From Swiss-Prot:
This is Uncharacterized protein Rv0481c. It comes from the Bacteria. InterPro entries: DUF2505, START-like_dom_sf. It comes from Mycobacterium tuberculosis (strain ATCC 25618 / H37Rv). One of its GO terms (biological process) is biological process involved in interaction with host.
Length: 174
Protein backbone atom coordinates (compact mmCIF):
# COMPACT_ATOMS: atom_id res chain seq x y z
CA UNK A 1 0.00 0.00 0.00
CA UNK A 2 1.53 3.36 -0.98
CA UNK A 3 2.72 5.65 1.79
CA UNK A 4 2.46 9.46 1.63
CA UNK A 5 4.85 11.98 3.12
CA UNK A 6 4.59 15.74 3.61
CA UNK A 7 7.83 17.72 3.74
CA UNK A 8 8.89 21.33 3.53
CA UNK A 9 12.02 23.40 3.23
CA UNK A 10 12.49 27.13 3.75
CA UNK A 11 14.75 29.20 1.51
CA UNK A 12 16.26 32.61 2.11
CA UNK A 13 15.74 33.39 -1.58
CA UNK A 14 12.42 34.53 -2.98
CA UNK A 15 10.20 32.30 -5.11
CA UNK A 16 11.52 34.07 -8.20
CA UNK A 17 15.17 33.59 -7.17
CA UNK A 18 14.74 29.87 -6.44
CA UNK A 19 12.77 29.35 -9.65
CA UNK A 20 15.41 31.25 -11.64
CA UNK A 21 18.10 28.90 -10.28
CA UNK A 22 16.09 25.96 -11.66
CA UNK A 23 16.56 27.39 -15.18
CA UNK A 24 20.31 26.79 -15.07
CA UNK A 25 21.87 23.47 -16.09
CA UNK A 26 24.92 24.47 -14.02
CA UNK A 27 22.69 24.71 -10.93
CA UNK A 28 21.40 21.16 -11.45
CA UNK A 29 24.86 19.74 -12.13
CA UNK A 30 26.27 21.40 -9.02
CA UNK A 31 23.27 20.34 -6.91
CA UNK A 32 23.67 16.75 -8.07
CA UNK A 33 27.36 16.88 -7.16
CA UNK A 34 26.34 17.65 -3.56
CA UNK A 35 24.04 14.65 -3.15
CA UNK A 36 25.30 11.64 -1.19
CA UNK A 37 25.43 9.20 -4.12
CA UNK A 38 28.28 7.67 -6.08
CA UNK A 39 27.29 8.91 -9.55
CA UNK A 40 24.79 11.65 -10.40
CA UNK A 41 23.95 12.86 -13.89
CA UNK A 42 21.70 15.46 -15.40
CA UNK A 43 20.01 13.42 -18.12
CA UNK A 44 18.05 16.32 -19.58
CA UNK A 45 16.82 19.84 -18.97
CA UNK A 46 14.27 21.63 -21.10
CA UNK A 47 13.39 25.23 -20.38
CA UNK A 48 10.35 26.97 -21.81
CA UNK A 49 8.19 23.99 -22.75
CA UNK A 50 6.92 23.43 -26.28
CA UNK A 51 6.88 27.14 -27.11
CA UNK A 52 10.33 27.73 -25.67
CA UNK A 53 9.19 30.63 -23.51
CA UNK A 54 6.30 29.51 -21.30
CA UNK A 55 8.33 29.53 -18.07
CA UNK A 56 8.32 25.77 -17.48
CA UNK A 57 11.37 23.76 -16.52
CA UNK A 58 11.58 20.00 -17.13
CA UNK A 59 14.48 18.16 -15.51
CA UNK A 60 15.44 14.48 -15.50
CA UNK A 61 18.26 13.24 -13.27
CA UNK A 62 19.79 9.84 -12.59
CA UNK A 63 21.52 9.10 -9.30
CA UNK A 64 23.35 5.85 -8.63
CA UNK A 65 24.55 4.27 -5.40
CA UNK A 66 27.11 1.49 -5.82
CA UNK A 67 26.07 -1.82 -4.30
CA UNK A 68 28.79 -1.74 -1.62
CA UNK A 69 27.33 1.53 -0.27
CA UNK A 70 23.72 0.32 0.03
CA UNK A 71 22.07 -0.51 3.38
CA UNK A 72 21.96 -4.23 4.22
CA UNK A 73 18.18 -4.43 3.87
CA UNK A 74 18.42 -3.08 0.32
CA UNK A 75 21.23 -5.44 -0.75
CA UNK A 76 19.13 -8.40 0.39
CA UNK A 77 16.45 -7.38 -2.11
CA UNK A 78 18.34 -5.69 -4.94
CA UNK A 79 21.42 -7.04 -6.66
CA UNK A 80 23.99 -4.64 -8.02
CA UNK A 81 24.05 -0.87 -8.11
CA UNK A 82 20.85 1.05 -7.41
CA UNK A 83 19.84 3.83 -9.82
CA UNK A 84 17.13 6.39 -9.09
CA UNK A 85 15.57 8.33 -11.97
CA UNK A 86 13.87 11.56 -10.94
CA UNK A 87 11.74 13.89 -13.05
CA UNK A 88 10.64 17.37 -12.01
CA UNK A 89 8.43 19.61 -14.10
CA UNK A 90 8.16 23.14 -12.74
CA UNK A 91 5.51 25.48 -14.03
CA UNK A 92 6.09 29.22 -14.36
CA UNK A 93 5.78 31.57 -11.41
CA UNK A 94 2.15 32.73 -11.34
CA UNK A 95 0.85 35.17 -8.74
CA UNK A 96 4.06 34.63 -6.75
CA UNK A 97 3.80 30.82 -6.62
CA UNK A 98 5.42 28.02 -8.65
CA UNK A 99 4.19 24.43 -8.71
CA UNK A 100 5.80 21.20 -9.86
CA UNK A 101 4.98 17.60 -10.53
CA UNK A 102 7.54 15.08 -9.37
CA UNK A 103 8.00 11.47 -10.43
CA UNK A 104 10.69 8.99 -9.58
CA UNK A 105 11.56 5.34 -9.80
CA UNK A 106 14.28 2.92 -8.92
CA UNK A 107 15.44 1.53 -12.25
CA UNK A 108 14.61 -2.18 -12.63
CA UNK A 109 12.87 -2.35 -9.25
CA UNK A 110 9.19 -2.26 -8.19
CA UNK A 111 9.53 1.20 -6.62
CA UNK A 112 7.79 4.39 -7.72
CA UNK A 113 7.37 7.87 -6.32
CA UNK A 114 5.05 10.66 -7.39
CA UNK A 115 3.91 13.94 -5.98
CA UNK A 116 3.75 17.69 -6.12
CA UNK A 117 5.77 20.63 -4.90
CA UNK A 118 4.63 24.18 -4.25
CA UNK A 119 7.09 27.05 -3.92
CA UNK A 120 5.40 29.96 -2.16
CA UNK A 121 6.51 33.18 -0.48
CA UNK A 122 7.09 33.61 3.24
CA UNK A 123 5.95 37.22 3.72
CA UNK A 124 7.61 37.67 7.13
CA UNK A 125 11.12 36.89 5.88
CA UNK A 126 10.98 37.63 2.16
CA UNK A 127 12.12 34.06 1.56
CA UNK A 128 10.18 31.12 0.21
CA UNK A 129 8.94 27.72 1.31
CA UNK A 130 8.82 24.56 -0.76
CA UNK A 131 6.06 22.22 0.38
CA UNK A 132 6.19 18.69 -0.99
CA UNK A 133 3.54 16.00 -0.93
CA UNK A 134 5.03 12.72 -2.09
CA UNK A 135 3.67 9.19 -2.32
CA UNK A 136 6.05 6.23 -2.38
CA UNK A 137 5.03 2.76 -3.48
CA UNK A 138 7.18 -0.35 -3.06
CA UNK A 139 5.48 -3.35 -4.60
CA UNK A 140 7.14 -6.08 -2.53
CA UNK A 141 4.83 -8.15 -0.30
CA UNK A 142 5.26 -7.97 3.48
CA UNK A 143 8.21 -5.54 3.55
CA UNK A 144 7.08 -2.86 1.11
CA UNK A 145 5.88 -0.62 3.94
CA UNK A 146 9.20 -0.82 5.76
CA UNK A 147 11.04 0.13 2.56
CA UNK A 148 8.60 2.98 1.91
CA UNK A 149 9.41 4.42 5.35
CA UNK A 150 13.15 4.02 4.70
CA UNK A 151 12.86 5.80 1.35
CA UNK A 152 10.72 8.54 2.92
CA UNK A 153 13.39 9.16 5.57
CA UNK A 154 16.12 9.31 2.93
CA UNK A 155 14.02 11.66 0.82
CA UNK A 156 13.53 14.00 3.76
CA UNK A 157 17.30 14.15 4.27
CA UNK A 158 17.78 14.81 0.55
CA UNK A 159 15.31 17.72 0.67
CA UNK A 160 17.40 19.27 3.47
CA UNK A 161 20.64 18.82 1.48
CA UNK A 162 19.05 20.37 -1.61
CA UNK A 163 17.66 23.30 0.42
CA UNK A 164 21.10 24.09 1.86
CA UNK A 165 22.70 23.85 -1.56
CA UNK A 166 20.07 26.04 -3.22
CA UNK A 167 20.39 28.72 -0.53
CA UNK A 168 24.16 28.81 -1.05
CA UNK A 169 23.78 28.79 -4.86
CA UNK A 170 21.44 31.80 -4.77
CA UNK A 171 23.78 33.68 -2.43
CA UNK A 172 26.71 33.10 -4.77
CA UNK A 173 24.98 33.41 -8.15
CA UNK A 174 22.10 35.90 -7.95
Amino acid sequence: MPRSFDMSADYEGSVEEVHRAFYEADYWKARLAETPVDVATLESIRVGGDSGDDGTIEVVTLQMVRSHNLPGLVTQLHRGDLSVRREETWGPVKEGIATASIAGSIVDAPVNLWGTAVLSPIPESGGSRMTLQVTIQVRIPFIGGKLERLIGTQLSQLVTIEQRFTTLWITNNV
